[in-house]
Design a protein with these regions (language model features):
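Short, well-ordered alpha-helical microsegments
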Residues: 99-102
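N-terminal glycine-rich "phosphate-gripper" loop used for MgATP/nucleotide binding
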Residues: 93-97
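Iron-sulfur (Fe-S) cluster-binding modules
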Residues: 1-67, 75, 79-91, 105-118, ...
Length: 228
Protein backbone atom coordinates (compact mmCIF):
# COMPACT_ATOMS: atom_id res chain seq x y z
CA UNK A 1 0.00 0.00 0.00
CA UNK A 2 0.96 3.66 -0.15
CA UNK A 3 2.79 4.68 2.99
CA UNK A 4 2.36 8.25 4.19
CA UNK A 5 3.07 10.34 7.25
CA UNK A 6 1.20 13.32 8.62
CA UNK A 7 2.97 16.62 8.04
CA UNK A 8 4.10 18.61 11.09
CA UNK A 9 1.08 20.47 12.51
CA UNK A 10 2.91 23.79 12.18
CA UNK A 11 3.09 23.27 8.44
CA UNK A 12 -0.61 22.38 8.16
CA UNK A 13 -1.61 25.37 10.31
CA UNK A 14 0.50 27.67 8.14
CA UNK A 15 -1.14 26.45 4.91
CA UNK A 16 -4.62 26.76 6.45
CA UNK A 17 -4.14 30.07 8.27
CA UNK A 18 -6.02 32.32 5.82
CA UNK A 19 -9.21 30.24 5.72
CA UNK A 20 -12.20 30.65 8.04
CA UNK A 21 -14.05 27.71 6.54
CA UNK A 22 -12.29 24.41 6.04
CA UNK A 23 -13.35 20.97 4.95
CA UNK A 24 -11.06 18.18 6.16
CA UNK A 25 -11.31 15.01 4.10
CA UNK A 26 -9.78 11.67 5.06
CA UNK A 27 -9.39 8.66 2.78
CA UNK A 28 -10.62 5.20 3.75
CA UNK A 29 -7.92 3.63 1.55
CA UNK A 30 -4.21 3.36 2.35
CA UNK A 31 -3.84 6.34 4.68
CA UNK A 32 -6.75 5.17 6.81
CA UNK A 33 -5.41 1.62 7.08
CA UNK A 34 -2.09 2.90 8.39
CA UNK A 35 -3.94 5.26 10.74
CA UNK A 36 -2.61 8.47 9.24
CA UNK A 37 -5.52 9.82 7.25
CA UNK A 38 -8.88 8.22 7.98
CA UNK A 39 -12.05 9.54 9.60
CA UNK A 40 -10.55 9.43 13.09
CA UNK A 41 -7.46 11.41 12.08
CA UNK A 42 -9.67 13.93 10.26
CA UNK A 43 -11.67 14.51 13.48
CA UNK A 44 -8.46 14.85 15.53
CA UNK A 45 -7.06 17.38 13.07
CA UNK A 46 -10.32 19.33 13.24
CA UNK A 47 -10.02 19.58 17.04
CA UNK A 48 -6.37 20.62 16.82
CA UNK A 49 -7.12 23.34 14.26
CA UNK A 50 -9.97 24.67 16.39
CA UNK A 51 -7.73 24.71 19.44
CA UNK A 52 -4.94 26.49 17.56
CA UNK A 53 -7.31 29.21 16.35
CA UNK A 54 -8.77 29.62 19.86
CA UNK A 55 -5.29 29.97 21.34
CA UNK A 56 -4.53 32.67 18.80
CA UNK A 57 -7.74 34.45 19.74
CA UNK A 58 -9.28 33.85 16.35
CA UNK A 59 -12.66 32.36 17.09
CA UNK A 60 -14.29 32.48 13.68
CA UNK A 61 -13.64 29.08 12.21
CA UNK A 62 -16.01 26.56 10.68
CA UNK A 63 -14.60 23.13 10.06
CA UNK A 64 -16.23 19.96 8.85
CA UNK A 65 -14.34 16.69 8.97
CA UNK A 66 -15.23 13.48 7.18
CA UNK A 67 -13.73 10.71 5.13
CA UNK A 68 -14.51 9.19 1.75
CA UNK A 69 -13.99 5.72 0.34
CA UNK A 70 -11.04 6.64 -1.89
CA UNK A 71 -9.65 10.01 -2.92
CA UNK A 72 -7.61 8.52 -5.78
CA UNK A 73 -10.76 7.59 -7.73
CA UNK A 74 -12.11 10.46 -9.83
CA UNK A 75 -15.74 9.35 -9.69
CA UNK A 76 -15.76 8.46 -6.00
CA UNK A 77 -14.04 11.73 -5.09
CA UNK A 78 -16.34 13.94 -7.12
CA UNK A 79 -19.62 12.22 -6.23
CA UNK A 80 -18.77 11.92 -2.52
CA UNK A 81 -17.68 15.53 -2.11
CA UNK A 82 -19.68 17.49 -4.68
CA UNK A 83 -22.38 18.60 -2.24
CA UNK A 84 -20.20 19.35 0.80
CA UNK A 85 -17.22 21.00 -0.91
CA UNK A 86 -19.25 23.91 -2.31
CA UNK A 87 -19.52 25.51 1.14
CA UNK A 88 -15.76 25.68 1.65
CA UNK A 89 -13.00 27.62 -0.11
CA UNK A 90 -10.34 25.14 1.00
CA UNK A 91 -10.05 21.42 1.62
CA UNK A 92 -7.45 19.74 3.79
CA UNK A 93 -6.74 16.31 2.34
CA UNK A 94 -5.42 13.44 4.42
CA UNK A 95 -4.85 11.25 1.37
CA UNK A 96 -1.65 10.50 -0.50
CA UNK A 97 -0.43 12.78 -3.28
CA UNK A 98 -2.68 11.00 -5.77
CA UNK A 99 -5.76 11.83 -3.70
CA UNK A 100 -4.70 15.46 -3.31
CA UNK A 101 -4.20 15.81 -7.07
CA UNK A 102 -7.51 14.13 -7.82
CA UNK A 103 -9.33 16.62 -5.59
CA UNK A 104 -7.41 19.52 -7.14
CA UNK A 105 -8.45 18.34 -10.60
CA UNK A 106 -12.09 17.73 -9.69
CA UNK A 107 -12.52 20.96 -7.73
CA UNK A 108 -10.29 23.47 -9.52
CA UNK A 109 -11.87 26.47 -7.75
CA UNK A 110 -10.86 25.14 -4.32
CA UNK A 111 -7.51 25.27 -2.58
CA UNK A 112 -6.48 21.72 -1.68
CA UNK A 113 -4.10 21.56 1.28
CA UNK A 114 -2.02 18.37 1.60
CA UNK A 115 -1.80 17.28 5.24
CA UNK A 116 0.35 14.20 4.70
CA UNK A 117 3.65 13.43 3.03
CA UNK A 118 3.54 10.45 0.70
CA UNK A 119 6.57 8.29 1.37
CA UNK A 120 6.63 5.04 -0.59
CA UNK A 121 4.93 1.77 -1.60
CA UNK A 122 5.51 -0.47 1.34
CA UNK A 123 4.71 -3.27 3.73
CA UNK A 124 3.34 -2.74 7.21
CA UNK A 125 4.78 -4.72 10.10
CA UNK A 126 2.00 -4.09 12.59
CA UNK A 127 3.78 -5.79 15.48
CA UNK A 128 6.91 -3.62 15.15
CA UNK A 129 4.87 -0.59 14.09
CA UNK A 130 7.17 -0.11 11.10
CA UNK A 131 6.82 0.35 7.37
CA UNK A 132 9.27 -0.93 4.81
CA UNK A 133 9.65 0.19 1.21
CA UNK A 134 9.17 -2.87 -1.00
CA UNK A 135 8.40 -1.80 -4.57
CA UNK A 136 9.29 1.16 -6.77
CA UNK A 137 6.67 0.37 -9.42
CA UNK A 138 9.38 -0.20 -12.02
CA UNK A 139 6.88 -1.50 -14.56
CA UNK A 140 8.69 -4.78 -15.31
CA UNK A 141 8.58 -7.02 -12.26
CA UNK A 142 11.42 -9.54 -11.84
CA UNK A 143 10.41 -10.98 -8.46
CA UNK A 144 9.97 -14.42 -10.02
CA UNK A 145 13.71 -14.50 -10.71
CA UNK A 146 14.82 -13.09 -7.39
CA UNK A 147 13.00 -15.26 -4.89
CA UNK A 148 10.34 -12.65 -4.18
CA UNK A 149 12.86 -10.05 -2.99
CA UNK A 150 13.03 -6.84 -5.01
CA UNK A 151 16.58 -5.73 -5.87
CA UNK A 152 15.35 -2.53 -7.54
CA UNK A 153 13.97 -1.33 -4.22
CA UNK A 154 15.85 -3.19 -1.53
CA UNK A 155 19.34 -2.96 -3.00
CA UNK A 156 20.53 0.61 -2.35
CA UNK A 157 22.08 0.68 -5.85
CA UNK A 158 19.24 -1.22 -7.58
CA UNK A 159 21.76 -3.72 -8.91
CA UNK A 160 20.48 -6.49 -11.16
CA UNK A 161 23.27 -9.06 -11.19
CA UNK A 162 24.33 -9.84 -7.67
CA UNK A 163 25.97 -7.91 -4.84
CA UNK A 164 28.49 -5.12 -5.18
CA UNK A 165 31.82 -5.27 -3.40
CA UNK A 166 30.48 -3.24 -0.53
CA UNK A 167 28.45 -5.87 1.29
CA UNK A 168 30.01 -7.06 4.54
CA UNK A 169 28.72 -9.99 6.58
CA UNK A 170 25.43 -9.80 4.71
CA UNK A 171 24.93 -6.10 5.41
CA UNK A 172 24.73 -3.26 2.87
CA UNK A 173 27.51 -0.68 2.84
CA UNK A 174 24.94 2.06 2.29
CA UNK A 175 23.21 3.20 5.48
CA UNK A 176 26.06 2.31 7.85
CA UNK A 177 25.38 -1.41 7.75
CA UNK A 178 21.91 -1.28 9.25
CA UNK A 179 20.17 -2.94 6.29
CA UNK A 180 20.60 -6.44 4.98
CA UNK A 181 22.22 -6.66 1.56
CA UNK A 182 19.30 -7.44 -0.76
CA UNK A 183 21.47 -9.64 -2.97
CA UNK A 184 22.62 -11.78 -0.03
CA UNK A 185 18.95 -12.21 0.91
CA UNK A 186 18.19 -13.17 -2.69
CA UNK A 187 21.09 -15.63 -2.79
CA UNK A 188 19.95 -17.30 0.44
CA UNK A 189 16.33 -17.48 -0.71
CA UNK A 190 17.22 -18.98 -4.09
CA UNK A 191 19.61 -21.44 -2.46
CA UNK A 192 16.85 -22.62 -0.12
CA UNK A 193 14.68 -23.20 -3.17
CA UNK A 194 17.43 -24.92 -5.13
CA UNK A 195 17.19 -22.20 -7.75
CA UNK A 196 20.70 -20.79 -7.85
CA UNK A 197 20.59 -20.95 -11.65
CA UNK A 198 18.43 -17.81 -11.38
CA UNK A 199 21.10 -16.13 -9.27
CA UNK A 200 23.78 -16.64 -11.93
CA UNK A 201 21.50 -15.67 -14.80
CA UNK A 202 22.75 -12.50 -16.50
CA UNK A 203 20.21 -9.72 -16.59
CA UNK A 204 20.58 -6.99 -19.22
CA UNK A 205 20.29 -3.33 -18.17
CA UNK A 206 16.67 -2.40 -17.73
CA UNK A 207 14.65 -0.61 -20.36
CA UNK A 208 13.76 2.54 -18.46
CA UNK A 209 11.27 3.59 -21.12
CA UNK A 210 8.72 1.39 -19.31
CA UNK A 211 9.00 3.62 -16.26
CA UNK A 212 9.18 7.05 -17.86
CA UNK A 213 7.00 9.57 -16.07
CA UNK A 214 4.12 10.20 -16.22
CA UNK A 215 2.84 6.73 -17.03
CA UNK A 216 -0.61 5.70 -18.22
CA UNK A 217 -2.42 2.41 -18.41
CA UNK A 218 -5.77 1.29 -19.81
CA UNK A 219 -8.34 2.97 -22.01
CA UNK A 220 -8.91 2.31 -25.66
CA UNK A 221 -5.75 2.11 -27.79
CA UNK A 222 -5.51 4.90 -30.33
CA UNK A 223 -6.33 3.78 -33.83
CA UNK A 224 -3.43 4.27 -36.17
CA UNK A 225 -4.18 6.06 -39.40
CA UNK A 226 -3.75 3.77 -42.36
CA UNK A 227 -1.42 4.98 -45.05
CA UNK A 228 -3.04 5.50 -48.42
S1 LIG B 1 10.81 -5.61 -9.65
FE1 LIG B 1 10.60 -4.53 -7.71
S2 LIG B 1 10.15 -2.43 -8.28
FE2 LIG B 1 9.75 -3.68 -10.07
S3 LIG B 1 7.54 -4.13 -9.93
FE3 LIG B 1 8.66 -5.86 -9.01
S4 LIG B 1 8.70 -5.37 -6.82
FE4 LIG B 1 8.20 -3.47 -7.89
S1 LIG C 1 25.82 -4.07 -0.42
FE1 LIG C 1 24.17 -5.27 -1.36
S2 LIG C 1 22.28 -4.06 -1.05
FE2 LIG C 1 24.02 -2.71 -0.68
S3 LIG C 1 24.38 -1.71 -2.60
FE3 LIG C 1 25.76 -3.48 -2.57
S4 LIG C 1 24.56 -5.13 -3.52
FE4 LIG C 1 23.11 -3.49 -3.04
Amino acid sequence: MIIAQQKPLKEIFEMAKNFKRLLIVGCDGCTSIIQVGGEKQAQVLKSLLEMERRLKGKKKLTIEASSILRQCDRDIASTSLRSSVKDYPAVISLACGVGVQTLAEQFPDKIIIPAVDTKFIGMHDTEAGKFYEMCRACGDCILFETGGICPITRCAKSLLNGPCGGQAKGKCEVGEGKNDCAWILIYNRLKERNKLDLFTKFRLPRDYRVSEHPRELGGEPEEKEEKA
